[in-house]
Every structure is written in C-alpha cells, then in structure tokens.
Design a protein with these regions (language model features):
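Classical protein tyrosine phosphatase
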Residues: 131-141
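Acidic, Ser/Thr/Pro-rich intrinsically disordered transcriptional activation regions
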Residues: 1-116, 120-121, 125-127
C-alpha cells in the first residue's frame, strides 16, 4: 500500500509535523472538523472553498494545525491513537508559534488565515487543554 503525503504551501520543510501525516488521515481529520467543530458556534470557512484551497496547497501550516488541534479528539485513526493529547498539544504549540511569527514578522501585513487560526487556538485553549503561555516562543504573560 502506498501512502501519499500532500505538500502544503508552508509545509515543505521536514520539520513540519504535517509532513509525517498521510493524506487520508489529514482528509479524515478535516472531515471531522467540518462535522463536529464548524458552526459550533462559529463558521470560519466556506467548506467547498477551504477543501479546494487545501487540495491546491494554499492553506497555511498554522491553519491546518489549528484545525487538527480542534478535531483530533474526535478521530479514530490509528495514526493518532494513544497520542491524541500529546499531538494536540504539539500541534497547538507549533500553530501558535507560527501564528505569532506571521503576525509580528510579516512585511505583507496580517493574513486572514492567521486570524482564523488564532481564534481556533484560543477557543481550544479556553475550552480544553490550555496551551501554557510559557511554552509559546516570544510570549510571556
């Protein structure tokens, strides 16, 4: 069986956690986001447009990680089993760090994907596992 890996616009680096997730796992976890999280209570995406942009590699790494952070808890994929809490924390921290980098170092201004990701991560932190502020690079409250 051949496992395919999608190359996202910002995930070409081997250091990205997304580089190790098979496409079918990404797809099924995104399905779970739209099934259980989208419109609960916020609708951040037009689903068809999001999926098209995702398939074309136009969704940033931090936004995909934010979506995974929200939806891994609903997954029964063997890839996540026994590591859901660990991976959720890892993905949330990586996403927060990337969002902060995007917000404070981009010369192009703030990207709306950063706002979507930050909001999803804030909801996650508020309602579930709190990502400790001292673990986020450059952030000390």
């Amino acid at each position: 069986m051949t496992v395919e890996y999608r190359t996202l616009s910002l995930t070409k680096h081997r250091s990205s956690p997304l580089s190790t997730i098979p496409d079918h796992v990404l797809d099924s976890t995104i399905d779970l986001y739209f099934l259980f999280c989208h419109n609960q209570p916020y609708a951040f995406f037009h689903e068809a447009t999001f999926r098209e942009d995702f398939d074309n590699g136009l969704i940033s790494e931090f936004l995909v990680l934010s979506i995974l952070t929200m939806s891994i808890r609903f997954s029964h994929e063997p890839y996540f089993q026994g590591r859901q809490e660990q991976l959720t924390t890892e993905y949330a921290l990586r996403a927060w760090n990337l969002v902060l980098h995007e917000c404070f170092s981009s010369e192009d201004g703030l990207d709306y994907h950063a706002v979507q990701a930050a909001t999803l991560l804030a909801i996650h932190d508020f309602t579930g596992t709190v990502t400790s502020a001292h673990n986020i690079e450059g952030s000390r409250y």
